[in-house]
C-alpha cells in the first residue's frame, strides 16, 4: 500500500509552519521538511510542500497515480472539489479519470485527519498499550482549531474523544502564555517542551509562576495574564 501525506493541506487559507511531506510504500518511509529542501524556513510563497513530495516519490520510485491514500490535515475553509480536482489532475496527475467520476475517487482516496488526534495517535501507536486514555494539549493546534485540548480513550484501534475544551483559560494556553512571556513566538514555543527535561526546577521561579495560575473544581484552570502586562 502507498500513502502520501502533506502538511499543510493544499488550498488551505491559513498560514502554517514547518511544511512537510511523508510517503509510505509498504515498509519504506520517506519523510522530510520543505524548508530543508528549499533552504527557506516557513516560506510564505509556498502553499504546500510540493518539492518534498516529489522528492519522496523519486526516492521510493513511485508515480502520483500509484498512491492508494492521500492524507491531509483538516482545512479551516470548506472543501471545494473543483480545487482538489485541479490539484490531482494538474499539479500531481494522480487522477486520470473523467471529471464526473472525480467525487467518487476523491472520497475513496483522500482522508482528512484531526490535528490534535494525530498527536494522540502518535503517542498511542508508539506505545505498547492495547488500550489507554489520552490527553492532548496542543493549544490551538492547527490555527483554525478552536479547541485547547482533547481528552478521550483508545481501544480496539479506535480513538474516542470524550471531552473538548474550547475556552481560553486552560493549561495549554497557560503554557503558551509563559513561553510568549519569555520571548518565544507562537510557532516556536513547542521547543521549550523538548528542552524542559534538561532543565532544573528553580524553587523561587516555581513559586512565582504558581502565583499566576489557579486550579479549582468549580472554575477549572484560571490564570492571570496581567502580571506580565500581556493581555492577549
Language-model-detected regions and their locations in the chain:
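Short acidic/glycine-rich loops and adjacent helix/strand connectors
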Residues: 1-232
